[in-house]
Amino acid sequence: MPTVDTAVVYPGMCFFEGTNISEGRGTTKPFEQIGSPYIDGDALAGVLNDLNLPGAAFRPVFFRPSFGKYAGESCRGIQVHVLDRSVFRAVSVGFGILAAVRGMYPGAFEWRVPNRGIHNFDKLAGTDRVRRAIDAGTSAADLERDWARDRRLFMEQRQSCLLYPQAAAIDTNRA
């Protein structure tokens, strides 16, 4: 990863690897920007900024990946700007962008072809529920609520497996 900013957004932007949208590989800002030839970056940035996702802002971008999806092709999309790391939730932002793109471009957006019967996205998300919810038109807020519930359940269940006490400074609600 080229920068700290890339690392901050990666937990939510890596989900685009399971779609036909470029996650910015082959550019100087992988995972900080997403796009494809079919996206209108101005329109998408407007929709995403209207969601008021905590700690995030979006701007339209153009890029041409040197490798990866759409290598050598002009892509339009958005760049994620983290305004406040203390409230930024990478997974929430990723889900918000996915839901917006799926809603805006239902005929063009695609999940990558399943590998051995399992969608690549499902491997990244750890479940097929997120993909199915996005396909059903579930809002970004509802996706985040469900993910947060599952995260809390996991954090409770893992307690008996921890070898060391959890440091008080670790924010387990992040990502």
Where are the regions a protein language model picked out?
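Glycine-rich, aromatic-lined ligand/substrate-binding cores of catalytic
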Residues: M1-V61
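Histidine-centered catalytic/metal-binding microenvironments
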Residues: D122-A175
